[in-house]
């Protein structure tokens, strides 16, 4: 059998597949940390592993910090993130967006990374007052919103851009509020 330059991924070892996926997750997180206007490479290869991991980490930390009904807190965070991303994506599609459903959900999911970091920071130092929590989470909300605008802002016609961005801001605001009230 002749080895090709691009082997079939079904033939590669599991560890190689996991490392390749982790590398792609890191690449996408890098673009969220340092948002740039050119997001074509990030949007081309969408995945849902990174958003799932970020959502699970956020939901776990918020449910751990809940005093009562930890399972309910986990469920609320998980449902708000995924249903909210789906609703915002459908809104973008209805406004003649030019990216696919899963590309948009992928980007919205990766852009919760700053809010996930804020959740972990607030969980580590649990005695934060609201005065300290608000700037941390507010900065994470702005960062998430700014990063997602860099990806999704150009996918909608300019005349409808505000109609597409406003629900994204609300989506991240709801998630930020869940982090603040933990």
From Swiss-Prot:
Domain of life of the organism encoding this protein: Eukaryota
Pfam families recorded: Yip1
Gene Ontology BP annotations: endoplasmic reticulum to Golgi vesicle-mediated transport
Entry keyword Membrane: yes
UniProt keyword annotations, A-Z: Golgi apparatus, Membrane, Transmembrane, Transmembrane helix
Membrane side Lumenal: residue ranges: 67-70, 126-133
GO CC, alphabetical: Golgi medial cisterna; Golgi membrane; Golgi trans cisterna; trans-Golgi network
Residues exposed to the Cytoplasmic side: 1-45, 92-104, 155-161
PANTHER family named in the record: GOLGI MEMBRANE PROTEIN YIP1 (PTHR21236), PROTEIN YIPF6 (PTHR21236:SF1)
Protein name: Protein YIPF6 homolog
Organism: Dictyostelium discoideum (Social amoeba)
Gene name in the database record: yipf6
């Amino acid at each position: 059998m002749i080895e090709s330059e691009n082997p079939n991924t079904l033939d590669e070892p599991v560890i190689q597949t996991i490392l390749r996926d982790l590398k792609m997750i890191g690449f996408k997180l890098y673009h969220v940390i340092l948002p740039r206007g050119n997001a074509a490479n990030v949007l081309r290869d969408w995945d849902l592993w990174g958003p799932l991991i970020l959502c699970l980490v956020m939901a776990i930390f918020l449910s751990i910090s809940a005093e009562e009904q930890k399972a309910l807190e986990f469920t609320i965070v998980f449902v708000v993130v995924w249903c909210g991303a789906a609703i915002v994506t459908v809104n973008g599609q209805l406004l003649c967006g030019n990216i696919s459903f899963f590309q948009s959900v992928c980007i919205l999911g990766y852009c919760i990374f700053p809010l996930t970091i804020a959740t972990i920071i607030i969980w580590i130092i649990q005695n934060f007052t609201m005065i300290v929590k608000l700037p941390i989470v507010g900065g994470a909300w702005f960062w998430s919103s700014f990063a997602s605008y860099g990806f999704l802002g150009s996918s909608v016609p300019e005349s409808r851009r505000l109609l597409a961005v406003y629900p994204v801001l609300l989506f991240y605001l709801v998630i930020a509020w869940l982090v603040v009230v933990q």
